[in-house]
Amino acid sequence: MNIKITKLALVVAASFSANAIANIEYPLMPGDPLVDQQWHLKNTGQAAFSDRGGKAGEDMNVSLTHAMGIMGAGVTAAVIDGGVEVKHPDLIDNARPGSWNFTNNSPDLAPGSPTDRHGTAVAGIIASSAFNGIGGRGVAPRAGLVGFNYLVSGNQTTANWLQSHGMYSDGFAKQSFDFPRVFNQSYGRTLSSPRSFDYEESPWLKTYEDAQEEITRTTHGGRGAIFVKSAGNGYERQTFTDSELGRGYLWFENRNHGLPLQNVNLERMDTSFWNLVASAYNADGELSSYSTVGSSVFVSAPGGQYGTSSPAIITTDVSGCEAGYNPLWLRNDLHGGHPLDPNCDYSARSNGTSAAAPNVAGAIAVIMSANPALSWLDVRNILATTSRRIDAEHPGVALSFKDSEGKQVSYQAIDKWQTNAAGYQYHNFYGFGAVDVDAAVNLARFYDKNLGEFVKTDRVLVTAEAEIPDGHLSGAQSTFNNDQELTVDAVQIRVNIDHTSTRDLAIELISPSGTRSVVMTPRTGTILGNNGMQNTQMLSHHFYGEQAKGEWTLRVIDTASEDEAYIFDPRTSGEPNVNMVHRNNTENGVLKSWDIRFFGRK
């Protein structure tokens, strides 16, 4: 049966254009009992053990690729997470040497407790085995897996970070065939104030960036590797773990005007060019309600919702009905010993951008296996070119507010889908769109594009000293004339702003071609951002393919002229929510200076 499907798929793939292939429906090959419910691989409207199904077709589109036998073979993915049950019956065949347990300094990566479940779920999304008669399957079911329990409490040292991200104790990236080409990082932080991206103040930032750059550009004979990073889960409810307020949740009135409490550019490592950041969409083909968004999002992938009223992601779980996600109180019809999973080895409740990132990592492994000669830069170009415009009619988000003159005004804080001057479509929710594995592999197999020489420019400092009017659309503006000729991959800025309410600020970067990128949305959860921004870094992919030469414009707009009420939930049983007020700034802010650098090609 499988041989016949594969032969047919090869004939079809050889005979049709990419557009023709995209318009043909292919079945997902059978062989795993849960695969029919894995909507993220093939969405037919199935409920995935929740109350209802989603919208058919909103998925990773892997059917033809899997039918052709392109499933990640020869590519190893690293799971940087908590423990991973590598001896799980659906993971063991893809386990490769190289995993490390930092807690006991051994290669035994078994979860240290029944609740250490996150890493096993992530690993299964990437590369749980196919056609073995159990469970479901991964996006890249023949890729290799290694893991590092860096996220376990007590393991988060710089040395451990470097090892888990591919840099060994001798200071060099390991050069070997089984060295990972894909690193999955399903982790991040939620911040209550903007942070500085300053190498002198935080030397570890340079250590991390230098390591990721070296591994990305030099490993595997120069073909390199790719780091995938989850965008975060802070759109509608901000979770604080390091706040002066203590541990808890934050909500603003009126659902924060429909705007995200956490912008992806507030997390410093999400502003690194070397991290390919993924947001999450649900089974209806819309942004997952929790997904953090922003201009450094590269692509989007399935993360689902919560697996109760609507689907989450089905993947491997720590084995046993008393471990992993199975014992959680949130109801899901798979959990607790379903006939298709009597030993409780799987979960239908994995979600978050923690699930979206490994979907992207698995897709990258498949793309690399389709054409092992592809470089890291080629793979990024393939994703930017072939990702699907999801939620195509989304209007963006307009913020209506009363300005300092008492007039009701509107600011377009998140644009609808935009096409830049190079023809690439981009949305701050979805980046270049939803990853389409079949389309990406179709391009990858015969890829012959010469992208040119990769270039990273030096930062250029621009002095501004421009006043930011309180609660007024006029904002502050500063320009920089760039004389370097290169094709843009991404643009990175750092800003220095004096302001006592950074939550109010929208920051825009406008290219010489007129493309506008909102690199910081207003009304973020930076309620403790009373000291402005010092070297706060932001990244934008919105200008991909455009020419860098010409005048770049930075605008900063203050979008509030009044105080705002919010609620703080201390997350402690029995303690009541606290009603609080965020005070508006009493003086105009100042855009002091900013710097800019380009990542691109000549």
Regions found by a protein language model. Give the residues of each.
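Gram-negative bacterial Sec-dependent N-terminal signal peptides
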Residues: 1-22
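Short beta-strand-plus-loop segments that form exposed binding edges in beta-rich domains
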Residues: 555-562
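Substrate-binding/access-modulating region of protease and related hydrolase catalytic domains
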Residues: 71-73, 129-133, 148-272, 340-358
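N-terminal domain-start motif of subtilase-like serine proteases
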Residues: 34-78, 104-115, 167, 209-217, ...
